[in-house]
């Protein structure tokens, strides 16, 4: 059965995992790291970089480097690169393509299905946008699950026989969630969730950036925030300082030649203490405490009922965050999970549940926000309360507001405010064909259906005429089927271009290597090679050099192969002359003349004497 991968699509970093031998395993990326920066960059030549390589060149290419795109999921935000507009779904899909390719390389097979995590407090538009991103990347998203819930799965997989109430505190790069869960007998039941989708490590970085920029401005009269390259250097320095202050009480921020004015170049060289960092970010830390209180209220538990507090997300490494949670809850924090990897591992476990590889696990999640419709007077009338276990279905009967009304508009909203206008509009649809009657007489049944992904379907039915209308919520910020199809095709085109570029690099590198080894070996052999043979090889080398910097890969391959075959023939002739009794066809392989393969020339004999020691050697003239 094909593998289903689990993906933590993060604001700043992403991670991919898979079930192997009944355990979730984090898949390293092509660069050897276990997490991949959620960064996409476009180069001047049209090349697209994703992950660590994209992040590394952000300073020199700030305008075409896209970071933290997850913060714009479910909005109409677009990124303009070289007069082409990209949606957050498309940029996220590029990160997903990278994770998918790394997983395929690791598993040695195609991957087409995934479970992807989202912040628990993501609304319907944001969840649908995440699912669309997966589709664009060539992945069938079998399930969208909440990040804290995924973390609890990874935490509790080996604790199936225990009964615990846990609080998951998830502070990532761009979002924050708190979930209260009850674990017991293989059932992971979410009791309540709360959070802030605009709070995360990026905001801690921004506080530092503003402090450094304001300090520099006070000293030099220059606002670095107006310089895109300088601000990118500040971002990198702020993130580095934040990380260092998690283990040290002081760090140095040194940015030479950050800018210049009429008096010459300007530099930043300042010390930053953990105490100052805590002062700058105190309000952000305090903002994380209210959702803890609200999630406890929603669950019906007291803090004394909570058995464990699980810290998830890279930003939970900040000492002030840990201290604040300890002080607020009065409990020690569980350190048994890797905050960067646990969410992806939980997604892989959910994938294992779907395939049947993981048995006796039942996940019961909740909808994070109240769902309702607008009724007379602009009031938001609730159909499904927040923290309701999903999947769920709820119906309620409404009527018309005017005499003779033959149609009604159903305005679907999500949020906690009492007036519809103050909540998030998920969609609108019209039920027409209602039989004319005095107001209050027609009976219109509105049904909300939330699936296991937290995605909403709404239907309305006139009980008198049987007329029915329904909508799968697709907010104006979400992509249409045609837009998704177009994005899928563009993603495939990018993938093909990336593959072609990779092949081009490999072919050209191979040509360079063959030329180098051929010229080196010719020099080493000296007058062992006749003038005629030497001229023949040099002619072939010239042909390779003439074509290797071009774009005609077939011409490069042909020229390289011609050179290789010519060299085979001549080297074989040399060794036959030196050793007439040697096996025919013996000779050097220029493909194997570098590094550890030097000296391992083929001798036309497959058998190897165990007592023979490979050694580097130098060919010298006979004396």
From Swiss-Prot:
Residues 605-623 have a biased composition (Basic and acidic residues). Residues 578-623 are annotated as: Disordered. Keywords: ATP-binding, Chaperone, Nucleotide-binding, Phosphoprotein, Stress response. It holds the Pfam family HSP70. It comes from the Bacteria. Belongs to the heat shock protein 70 family. This is Chaperone protein DnaK. The lineage of its organism: Bacteria, Bacillati, Bacillota, Clostridia, Eubacteriales.
């Amino acid at each position: 059965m094909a593998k289903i991968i689990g993906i933590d699509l993060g604001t700043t970093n992403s991670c991919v995992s898979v079930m192997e031998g009944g355990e979730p395993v984090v898949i390293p990326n092509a660069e050897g790291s276990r997490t991949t920066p959620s960064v996409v960059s476009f180069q001047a030549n049209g090349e697209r970089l994703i992950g660590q390589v994209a992040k590394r060149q952000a300073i020199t290419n700030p305008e075409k480097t896209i970071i933290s795109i997850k913060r714009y999921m479910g909005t109409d935000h677009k990124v303009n690169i070289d007069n082409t507009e990209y949606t957050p779904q498309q940029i996220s899909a590029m990160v997903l393509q990278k994770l998918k390719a790394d997983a395929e390389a690791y598993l040695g097979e195609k991957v087409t299905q995934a479970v992807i995590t989202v912040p628990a407090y993501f609304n319907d538009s944001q969840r649908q946008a995440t699912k669309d991103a997966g589709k664009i990347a060539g992945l069938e998203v079998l399930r969208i699950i909440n990040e804290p819930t995924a973390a609890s799965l990874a935490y509790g997989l080996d604790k199936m026989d225990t009964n615990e109430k846990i609080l998951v505190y998830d502070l990532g790069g761009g979002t924050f969630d708190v979930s209260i869960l009850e674990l017991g007998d293989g059932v992971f039941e979410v009791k309540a969730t709360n959070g802030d989708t605009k709070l995360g490590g990026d905001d801690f970085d921004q506080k530092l950036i503003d402090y450094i920029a304001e300090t520099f401005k006070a000293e030099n009269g220059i606002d670095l925030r107006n310089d895109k390259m300088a601000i990118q250097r500040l971002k990198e320095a702020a993130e580095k300082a934040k990380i260092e202050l998690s283990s040290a009480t002081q760090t140095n921020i040194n940015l030479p030649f950050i800018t210049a004015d009429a008096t010459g170049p300007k530099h930043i060289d300042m010390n930053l203490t953990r105490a100052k960092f805590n002062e700058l970010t105190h309000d952000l830390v305090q903002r994380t405490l209210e959702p803890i209180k609200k999630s406890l209220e929603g669950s019906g538990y007291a803090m004394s009922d909570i058995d464990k507090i699980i810290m998830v997300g890279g930003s939970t490494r900040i000492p002030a965050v840990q201290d604040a949670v300890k002080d607020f809850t009065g409990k020690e924090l569980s350190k048994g999970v890797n905050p960067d990897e646990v969410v992806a591992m939980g997604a892989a476990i959910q994938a294992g549940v779907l395939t049947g590889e993981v048995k006796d696990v039942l996940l019961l999640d909740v909808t994070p926000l109240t769902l309702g419709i607008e009724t007379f007077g602009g009031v938001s009338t609730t159909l499904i309360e927040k923290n309701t276990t999903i999947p769920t279905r709820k119906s309620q009967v409404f009527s018309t507001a005017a005499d003779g009304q033959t149609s009604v508009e159903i305005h679907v909203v999500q949020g906690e405010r009492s007036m519809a206008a103050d909540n998030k509009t998920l969609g609108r649809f019209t039920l027409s064909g209602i039989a004319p009657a005095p107001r209050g007489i027609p009976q219109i049944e509105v049904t909300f259906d939330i699936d296991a992904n937290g995605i909403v379907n709404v239907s309305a039915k006139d009980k008198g005429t049987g007329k029915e209308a329904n909508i799968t919520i697709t907010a104006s910020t979400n992509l249409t089927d045609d837009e998704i199809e177009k994005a899928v095709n563009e993603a495939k085109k990018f993938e093909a271009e990336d593959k072609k570029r990779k092949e081009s690099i490999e072919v050209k590198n191979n040509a360079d290597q063959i030329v180098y080894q051929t010229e080196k070996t010719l020099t080493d052999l000296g007058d062992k090679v006749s003038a005629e043979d030497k001229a023949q090889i040099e002619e072939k080398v010239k042909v390779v050099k003439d074509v290797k910097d071009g774009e005609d890969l077939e011409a490069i391959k042909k020229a390289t192969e011609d050179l290789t075959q010519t060299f085979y023939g001549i080297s074989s002739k040399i060794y036959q002359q030196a050793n007439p009794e040697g096996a025919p066809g013996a000779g050097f392989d220029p493909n194997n003349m570098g590094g550890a393969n030097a000296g391992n020339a083929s001798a036309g004999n497959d058998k190897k004497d165990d007592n023979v020691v490979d050694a580097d050697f130098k060919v010298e003239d006979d004396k």
